[in-house]
Amino acid sequence: MYMSNPKNLLTVCLLTSTLITHAQCMRVHYDDGWTEQIAVGHVDSITFSQNEQHLAPTIMLNNGLQMPAFGIGTYSLKNQTCFNSVYTALKNGYRLIDTAYMYGNEEELGRAVRQAVADGICQREDITVITKIYPGTQFANPEKAIQERLDLLDIGYIDIMLLHHPGENDVKAYKAMEKFVEAGKIRSLGISCFYIDELKRFLPQVSIKPVLVQNEIHPYYQDTEVVDYIHSQGIVVQAWYPLGGRGHQSELLSDPVLQCIAEAHGKSLVQVILRWHYQRRVVAIPRLKQSCPHS
């Protein structure tokens, strides 16, 4: 789904929680790093850990670093539209931005991050930027591909770098990324579109455990077995197409069961879907479309 206003999306995420005072809460830590506050006496009520800026809640990764539990994807955003979109998203509280070599927008995204930091909107260390390298020539010559991502983004370091898909030389490419972690140029590593068989093959061959696996997840493609397996490895699950994948989006967003749930709780259907992800301990990154001019 496209979201035309990044502030609205973050707002609907936050409004889905049950608001209770800190004194009424106890904090629950899961082995996979996810943290929730549970209302004492009301175990079905969960509140986010929020600050006064209304930023998204954060989760602990398996390397001790933190990442927002909600973010935005930038697939299909190009040129000035990408700059405007990312800058506006940061201005409105987003701190998790996803891109990739294949999106062709890393340079504009990096420029927006630098501008937001220069304008005092946020600090660089508060932003999590994810990018990816792609199978084929980039896996065959990963050092070059990784350095190109660093140069195009030009934001000092990359927070999380992923392998976009499994493929020939994926272990070689990941091991190259590990060297960049050791050099301080990348902070965390991850993988995308990996399922149980690929994970069982891949994980024993690498030294640095991925902090996240980014897969297609939504109510019409729940993939519970895969999600549970990834969580069992102490790895965060991140959902692309969280509001419905190709061929499912319009159907999901008009689903009568979800509509009934939304009406019963006085929420929008999108709020219900995002809450579903959050309560499954899945990080949602809906795709953003925003073309308002930067000012």
Model-predicted segments: where are they?
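N-terminal binding-site loop/beta-alpha segment at the start of enzyme catalytic domains
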Residues: 52-127, 243-244
